[in-house]
């Protein structure tokens, strides 16, 4: 792992830890443009009660704000961003990344339930007409660390789950 990737992934894991500390699925990400963070996010699904507030979507909103404040065309910025994220983007997020023409995603562990970079569907690389541009992805950076954070979260009881869905932990 290059020092640059290690540095950005370390910061993404800080975002994931913040998500965990706030009762969210521990996923964190950074969007890096011209060697600076222009968007960062962590899952905010539980606190906003909005199932679309994944780390990547939060970061996309921050990039749009950054572009507006810095008089940059968002299209030009997104086409030159590298996304560093602790877990493989889900199908929804991979679709958004593709539509925005983000060229490269570096992620930690695979997302075996919802992964959009090949674990479930290859939204990133399949030839899908009228859905943006394929993007490259590199997975496996600190995968064990990402999995441990996820295990920690799923060992807890989700206080936001409906009573009928709460499972007893053994």
From Swiss-Prot:
Taxonomic source organism: Xenopus tropicalis (Western clawed frog)
Keyword GTP-binding: no
Keywords on record: Hydrolase, Metal-binding, tRNA processing, Zinc
Catalytic activity: adenosine(34) in tRNA + H2O + H(+) = inosine(34) in tRNA + NH4(+)
InterPro entries: APOBEC/CMP_deaminase_Zn-bd, CMP_dCMP_dom, Cytidine_deaminase-like, tRNA_aden_deaminase
Enzyme class name: hydrolase
Domain CMP/dCMP-type deaminase: 3-128
Name the record gives this protein: tRNA-specific adenosine deaminase 2
Similarity-based family: Belongs to the cytidine and deoxycytidylate deaminase family. ADAT2 subfamily.
Keyword set includes Glycoprotein: no
GO terms of molecular function: tRNA-specific adenosine-34 deaminase activity; zinc ion binding
Binding site for Zn(2+): 54, 90, 93
């Amino acid at each position: 792992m290059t020092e640059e990737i290690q540095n950005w992934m370390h910061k993404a894991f800080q975002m994931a830890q913040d998500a965990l500390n706030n009762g969210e699925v521990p996923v964190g990400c950074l969007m890096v443009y011209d060697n600076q963070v222009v968007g960062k996010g962590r899952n905010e699904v539980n606190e906003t009660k909005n199932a679309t507030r994944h780390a990547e979507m939060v970061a996309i909103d921050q990039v749009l704000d950054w572009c507006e404040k810095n008089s940059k065309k968002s299209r030009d910025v997104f086409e030159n961003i590298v996304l560093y994220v602790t877990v493989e983007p889900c199908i929804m997020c991979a679709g958004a990344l593709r539509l925005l023409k983000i060229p490269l995603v570096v992620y930690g562990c695979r997302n075996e339930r919802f992964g959009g970079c090949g674990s479930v569907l290859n939204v990133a690389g399949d030839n899908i007409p009228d859905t943006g541009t394929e993007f490259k992805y590199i997975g496996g950076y600190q995968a064990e660390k990402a999995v441990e954070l996820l295990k920690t979260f799923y060992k807890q009881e989700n206080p936001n789950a409906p009573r009928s869905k709460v499972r007893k932990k053994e």
